[in-house]
């Protein structure tokens, strides 16, 4: 090796000790949170950005080992996506470059969109942990509310092993899991007292879907919120396809709703 390159020598034991120590410190810190967001797609990461920017302790769980949700797949794997106003203001705030194609309509590169959205959320103070699946919620009575989540390693679930989860508390839980609204679905099935009915997502009607998804983002039951494509599933709205304005605006709106609700609680 060249004498001009001085690489710090660190053995395998130290590597393991540092990783385990710092990881456990993070988990101990994030057992209690202001907000837990399930899903690191465009809505989840937008929500994380605005919540953390406001000073709320925000934790995002993502079952995969990557960011972005549906951004990366784009439209039939094409690497360009559509953003419409006023969502462009959110992307500009995060220094994501846009190409204007007509008044109020922009094209964004999917890789840049994912990377800078994640970086913005992290820089604002949100913690994102990959490879973790949320498979249940915590609830409380008097008053009835959702009070956190149960989590398991995604790899453990994929292996089909019977392993109990650990519990993470939160004043607000956001389902940003996408088309299946997985967290709300579990709460609906296992806590019928919440009175949640899920009509399911409808077929495509982009103009209607973009508007209604943002408008109907918000609380589903005390302590439980929906954002992004989870909104279409829970509210019975149409899908919109590879136009992502409503996703980032939905994330921003759910953050604003939670900030207001926690302030008033």
Swiss-Prot record:
Metabolic or biological pathway: Cofactor biosynthesis; thiamine diphosphate biosynthesis
Keywords on record: Iron, Metal-binding, NAD, Thiamine biosynthesis, Transferase
One GO molecular-function entry: iron ion binding
Entry's EC annotation: 2.4.2.59
Family membership noted in the UniProt record: Belongs to the THI4 family.
Positions of glycine binding: 239
Superkingdom assignment: Archaea
Entry binding sites for NAD(+): 43, 62-63, 70, 134, 162-164, 229
Cofactor: Fe(2+)
Keyword Metal-binding: yes
Role: Involved in the biosynthesis of the thiazole moiety of thiamine. Catalyzes the conversion of NAD and glycine to adenosine diphosphate 5-(2-hydroxyethyl)-4-methylthiazole-2-carboxylate (ADT), an adenylated thiazole intermediate, using free sulfide as a source of sulfur.
Catalytic activity field: hydrogen sulfide + glycine + NAD(+) = ADP-5-ethyl-4-methylthiazole-2-carboxylate + nicotinamide + 3 H2O + H(+)
Organism of derivation: Sulfolobus acidocaldarius (strain ATCC 33909 / DSM 639 / JCM 8929 / NBRC 15157 / NCIMB 11770)
Self-association state and partner proteins as the record states: Homooctamer; tetramer of dimers.
GO process annotations (BP): thiamine biosynthetic process; thiamine diphosphate biosynthetic process; thiazole biosynthetic process
Residues engaged in binding Fe cation: 164, 179
UniProt enzyme class: transferase
Pfam families in alphabetical order: Thi4 (PF01946)
Protein name: Thiamine thiazole synthase
């Amino acid at each position: 090796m060249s004498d001009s390159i001085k690489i710090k020598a660190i053995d395998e034991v130290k590597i393991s000790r540092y990783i385990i120590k710092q990881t456990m410190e993070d988990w101990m810190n994030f057992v209690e949170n202001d907000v837990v967001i399930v899903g690191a797609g465009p809505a989840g990461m937008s929500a994380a950005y605005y919540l953390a920017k406001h000073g709320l302790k925000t934790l995002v769980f993502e079952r995969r080992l990557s960011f972005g949700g549906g951004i990366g797949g784009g439209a039939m794997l094409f690497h360009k996506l559509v953003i419409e106003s006023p969502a462009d203001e959110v992307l500009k705030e995060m220094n994501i470059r846009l190409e204007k194609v007509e008044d109020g309509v922009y094209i964004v590169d999917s890789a840049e969109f994912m990377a800078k959205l994640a970086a913005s959320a992290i820089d604002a103070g949100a913690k994102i942990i990959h490879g973790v699946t949320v498979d249940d919620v915590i609830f409380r009575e008097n008053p009835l509310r959702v009070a956190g989540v149960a989590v398991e390693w995604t790899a453990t679930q994929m292996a089909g092993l019977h392993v109990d989860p650990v519990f993470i508390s939160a004043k607000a839980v956001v389902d940003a899991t996408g088309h299946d609204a997985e967290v709300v679905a579990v709460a609906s099935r296992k806590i019928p007292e919440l009175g949640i009915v899920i009509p399911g997502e409808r077929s495509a009607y982009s103009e209607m879907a973009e508007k209604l998804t943002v408008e109907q983002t918000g609380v589903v039951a005390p302590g439980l919120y929906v954002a992004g494509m989870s909104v279409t599933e829970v509210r019975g709205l149409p899908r919109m396809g590879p136009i992502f304005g409503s996703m980032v605006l939905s994330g921003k709106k759910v953050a604003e709703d939670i900030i207001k609700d926690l302030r008033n609680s």
